[in-house]
Regions:
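Acidic, divalent-metal-binding catalytic cores of TOPRIM
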Residues: 111-205
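Right-hand nucleic-acid polymerase module
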Residues: 4-121
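Short, flexible/disordered intra-domain loops and linkers
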Residues: 2-10, 188-193
Length: 205
């Protein structure tokens, strides 16, 4: 943090090397850089300064992948067709970094105050849950409704073979999915954990 250390660089490196070797390690000079705390430091896709940020190129690539997915139904990662889970992993990684920064700044962060990236993530989540899902999604009003519906379907599975099938091992295979209300969906899509306004909020998109 002391920018005057550059005037004593040789002494500093000697002391640093001595401490590292004392701990049983060896300093690799080819992979060692000295930076000020506000210098741009790139580590595995992260720009590590006083405030952590995602490398701009990583963000742009993720946004481009999502755009191609929405337009064509597919996208590539390293010249191979990517999966929805892979793309969600990239969005989730960026979001984790931004959530950390949101905690330390003084701005308001909620559904009505999404930044540019969060709006991109919002669009992806809507695409995943309400467009690209491979099963019809049932949206319930209360969080316990899912348990009651599942229990009823199991009891009457022979009457609703398009919704549920009992397998040979006795387990049930649901042909429908249930939307689980999470903090993430509440933040990005305004889908609260309880409430009757869920369908109204979904239809806004």
């Amino acid at each position: 943090n002391d920018k005057k250390f550059i005037d004593q660089i040789d002494y500093f490196l000697h002391k640093l090397t001595k401490e590292i070797e004392k701990a049983g390690f060896k300093l690799n000079k080819n992979k060692t850089n000295l930076n000020f705390k506000d210098s741009r430091q790139l580590v595995t896709g992260l720009v590590v300064n006083k405030k952590i940020n995602v490398d701009r190129r990583y963000y742009k690539e993720t946004r481009a992948m999502a755009h191609r997915l929405y337009k064509t139904g597919e996208f590539q990662i390293d010249d191979k067709n990517g999966t929805l889970n892979q793309l969600e992993g990239r969005f989730s990684f960026i979001n984790q970094v931004q959530r950390y920064n949101n905690v330390i700044d003084s701005s308001k962060h909620d559904f009505n105050n999404l930044n540019a990236f969060e709006k991109q993530y919002q669009a992806f989540l809507f695409y995943k849950y309400f467009y690209a899902n491979n099963k019809p999604h049932i949206v319930t009003e209360g969080k316990t409704d899912i348990n009651y519906i599942k229990a009823a379907l199991k009891k009457h599975h022979l009457e609703f073979p398009n919704l549920i099938v009992k397998k040979e091992d006795g387990e049930f295979d649901f042909r429908v999915a249930f939307l689980k209300r999470t903090n993430r969906l509440a933040y990005f899509l305004n889908i609260k954990k309880d409430g009757a306004d869920t369908m109204k909020n979904i239809c806004k998109y």
